[in-house]
Amino acid sequence: MRSLTLAAVLACSLLLVFHTSAAEELEVQDGHLMNPGDGDTALATVDDERIIECFFSCEIEKDGKSKEGKPCKPKGDKNKDKKCSGGWRCKIKMCLKI
């Protein structure tokens, strides 16, 4: 009976040692993961480039330089038939690619 108790205690302590070492390893790996609050500069740059691209495309359509584009109409404009074309939508007086 004593040997069975001793074996159970040793097994539990061995399991505890493995569990704590695995938990420490996960803590070390957790430092390498990106947290949700961290900003990613590459994604921010892409978003800025898209906004600039949308703005320039809208300006081209407004100026009539695009053969198939129509002028971007702001909300409340009297010319409701004029819209952005080619997948662009008018938002905040700018054509945005959707």
UniProtKB/Swiss-Prot annotation:
Residues 24-50 form a propeptide. Keywords: Disulfide bond, Neurotoxin, Secreted, Signal, Toxin. Disulfide bonds join 54-84, 58-90, 72-95. Transmembrane segments: none annotated. The keyword Phosphoprotein does not apply. It is found in: Secreted. Residues 63-84 are annotated as: Disordered. Residues 1-23 form the signal peptide. Its main location: secreted. The keyword Disulfide bond applies. InterPro entries: Hwtx-2-like. Expressed by the venom gland. GO terms for cellular component: extracellular region. One of its GO terms (molecular function) is toxin activity. Belongs to the neurotoxin 12 (Hwtx-2) family. 01 (Ap1a) subfamily. Is toxic to both insects and mammals. Induces reversible paralysis when injected into S.frugiperda larvae. Reduces both the amplitude and frequency of responses from muscle (GF-TTM and GF-DLM) pathways in the D.melanogaster giant fiber circuit, suggesting an action at the neuromuscular junction, which is mediated by glutamatergic receptors. In mice, intracranial injection of 30 ug causes increased urination, myoclonus, hypermotility with circular movements followed by respiratory and generalized seizures resulting in death within 25-35 minutes of injection. Negative results: has no effect on human Nav1.2/SCN2A, Nav1.4/SCN4A, Nav1.5/SCN5A or Nav1.6/SCN8A voltage-gated potassium channels (at 1 uM). Does not alter the response induced by acetylcholine in a rhabdomyosarcoma cell preparation (at 1 uM). This is U1-theraphotoxin-Ap1a.
